[in-house]
Amino acid sequence: MIPPQEASARRREIEDKLKQEEETLSFIRDSLEKSDQLTKNMVSILSSFESRLMKLENSIIPVHKQTENLQRLQENVEKTLSCLDHVISYYHVASDTEKIIREGPTGRLEEYLGSMAKIQKAVEYFQDNSPDSPELNKVKLLFERGKEALESEFRSLMTRHSKVVSPVLILDLISGDDDLEAQEDVTLEHLPESVLQDVIRISRWLVEYGRNQDFMNVYYQIRSSQLDRSIKGLKEHFHKSSSSSGVPYSPAIPNKRKDTPTKKPVKRPGTIRKAQNLLKQYSQHGLDGKKGGSNLIPLEGLLPCTPRGGLPGPWINAACVCAADISPGHEHDFRVKHLSEALNDKHGPLAGRDDMLDVETDAYIHCVSAFVKLAQSEYQLLADIIPEHHQKKTFDSLIQDALDGLMLEGENIVSAARKAIVRHDFSTVLTVFPILRHLKQTKPEFDQVLQGTAASTKNKLPGLITSMETIGAKALEDFADNIKNDPDKEYNMPKDGTVHELTSNAILFLQQLLDFQETAGAMLASQETSSSATSYSSEFSKRLLSTYICKVLGNLQLNLLSKSKVYEDPALSAIFLHNNYNYILKSLEKSELIQLVAVTQKTAERSYREHIEQQIQTYQRSWLKVTDYIAEKNLPVFQPGVKLRDKERQIIKERFKGFNDGLEELCKIQKAWAIPDTEQRDRIRQAQKTIVKETYGAFLQKFGSVPFTKNPEKYIKYGVEQVGDMIDRLFDTSA
């Protein structure tokens, strides 16, 4: 049971809470009533706004739509007026542009092309919208006239401004690749820049709007003519220069003229003078050697003066030959200045058929290089003017005349070489070697230039190379056979037993091959493998060339043996073979031939030395008929202090007389013989002098004091030293 006090307190607490709750409820009820009132007021305001907005919309929308329609109508009117103006302008194009078209594009290309664009648009409009309109025919006719005028202007610009490239500029262009000191590149300006830009614009217009390719034919015809004339002009330059000065130009002249190249000339291989002609010239001019010499100039003196690997010009240049060029074993009265003056004074400068061959060869080689450079330049020009898909075909047509001219000239060279082979004029055939070498060196550039041209165009150079390789191989083979089969003719044999012309010519020919080892090897290899020169190794071709040279030397040796039998005197035959073998050996050693021969014949040098010694021994046997008279083994035995019988005195007389007569006869005969090599001549004299002096000295010592005659001076005609002096005068026509 709760106490009364706690119950009373709890009741008061509950009553207070109830009173608070009632107050809260009353507040909430008042707030709700206010909210309802506000909501009603807002709904009333919104309803009024909506009503007013609808009234406004109903009044504005019709006005807006009406304004929009008016704007559309205005735009349509403006477009219609613009279209009318545009259409009307097409009807005025003919009259507006006729004067410009009639006057042509010269000097006003930009304006002219603008007029042509207007005419083109007018044509397109009338074709699409009024194909039966007379205006269409009018503007089409005007368009055709304008196009023809542009084509004519294109032709005129190309014709007036396309100039032949001067030979001097071409030579500078060719020299540019080899001149390491060149400070700037040589460039060709085929057309002035302003003209080039006009030509490019016209060509592009004709391609895009003219739909006409005739201008491409005009282009290649004009440029083809200039290319061909440029190359022919270079060739004529060589001919004129050679006829006036003997050389195309001279960079040594300090005062540069307009016709003087600005760069050093490119060294190009010339041809080789014929040994036969030179030998004939020297003999005619009386250039006899000194002691023991002959009319034959030593081979070393005839070699081109350019170093190995260089490119020889004329076959002999007197100004280039010096004492160092002549073998120590050949002593000759060879004075460069006097020789040159003697030849020029008596016969004029050497400018005969062989000089012309040099000029033709050098000119052709330069023309080949010029073609490559000019063709490259032409393609660069063509690439700016001709559309890309027409460039290769146009370029092919452009280069045909010049290329055909070069190929025809090359075939003529092959034909001339073929005729020279028939005549056994093998030195003339050597013109093929420098040309073939240059063609093969230039072939990569050729292939690059001709890339994209027709197959027939690309195959022209390989065909010419094959022809030259074939004719060169035939020349080499026929030369070897000719050396072997050269007839033995007494009138053609040297009376003094010196070097035969066949030997000097053969060695000279082989030495000329040293400058063209790779080319000659390619010729031989092409026949060996029946394929192009690209399918063999350089070592293989070197062995083939070595084998060939050994074959020629073998044929030469056999022929010399045969020729030596023409001599009735075995001693002269031995001297002849000795001179020729010694000449061959010295020539091989002087040049690089000995190394080339050693590729396949290691013992060649030793073999020639053995042959030389054999001939010396054969020659020495000719003195046996002299020394046998006084040889110890053939002398009778005499008792010292015993008086000689008549028979014994007669034997001694016969010995002295036989020796004297034999000595005089041999000295008289052999005095006219020749051993051009000073070293060999002195060696043979000394050896023979030693043998004869020792034998004669012993004989004289034994019988000189014997009273075998009342007139000893009749039989003892020579002292020992006198005999030596007589032998010293052997092989000396001046003694």
UniProtKB/Swiss-Prot annotation:
Main localization category: cytoplasm
Tissue specificity as recorded in UniProt: Abundant in the ventricular zone, the outer subventricular zone and the cortical plate of the fetal cortex.
Gene Ontology biological process: exocytosis; membrane fission; mitotic cytokinesis; positive regulation of mitotic cytokinetic process; protein transmembrane transport; regulation of entry of bacterium into host cell; regulation of macroautophagy; vesicle docking involved in exocytosis
Coiled coil: 5-42, 63-85
GO CC aspect terms: centriolar satellite; cytosol; exocyst; Flemming body; growth cone membrane; membrane; microtubule organizing center; midbody
InterPro entries xrefs: Cullin_repeat-like_dom_sf, Exo70, Exo70_C
Source species, domain of life: Eukaryota
SUPFAM superfamilies: Cullin repeat-like
Membrane topology, record value: Peripheral membrane protein
Chain residue ranges for the region called Disordered: 239-268
Pfam family for this entry, one: Exo70_C
Location relative to the cell: Cytoplasm, Cytosol; Cell membrane; Midbody, Midbody ring
Keywords: Cell membrane, Coiled coil, Cytoplasm, Epilepsy, Exocytosis, Membrane, Phosphoprotein, Protein transport, Transport
Residues recorded as bearing Phosphoserine in the entry: S133
GO function terms (MF aspect): phosphatidylinositol-4,5-bisphosphate binding; protein-macromolecule adaptor activity
Transmembrane segments: none
Protein family (similarity comment): Belongs to the EXO70 family.
Subunit structure comment from the entry: The exocyst complex is composed of EXOC1, EXOC2, EXOC3, EXOC4, EXOC5, EXOC6, EXOC7 and EXOC8. Interacts with ARHQ in a GTP-dependent manner. Interacts with RAB11FIP3.
Domain remarks: The N-terminus is involved in SEC8 and ARHQ binding. The C-terminus is required for translocation to the plasma membrane.
Disease: Neurodevelopmental disorder with seizures and brain atrophy: An autosomal recessive disorder characterized by brain atrophy, seizures, and developmental delay. Disease severity is variable. Severely affected individuals develop symptoms in utero, which may lead to spontaneous abortion. Patients at the mildest end of the phenotypic spectrum have onset of seizures later in childhood and show developmental delay with mildly impaired intellectual development and minimal brain atrophy.
Function: Component of the exocyst complex involved in the docking of exocytic vesicles with fusion sites on the plasma membrane. In adipocytes, plays a crucial role in targeting SLC2A4 vesicle to the plasma membrane in response to insulin, perhaps directing the vesicle to the precise site of fusion. It is required for neuron survival and plays an essential role in cortical development.
Protein name: Exocyst complex component 7
Source organism phylogeny: Eukaryota, Metazoa, Chordata, Craniata, Vertebrata
Gene name for this UniProt entry: EXOC7
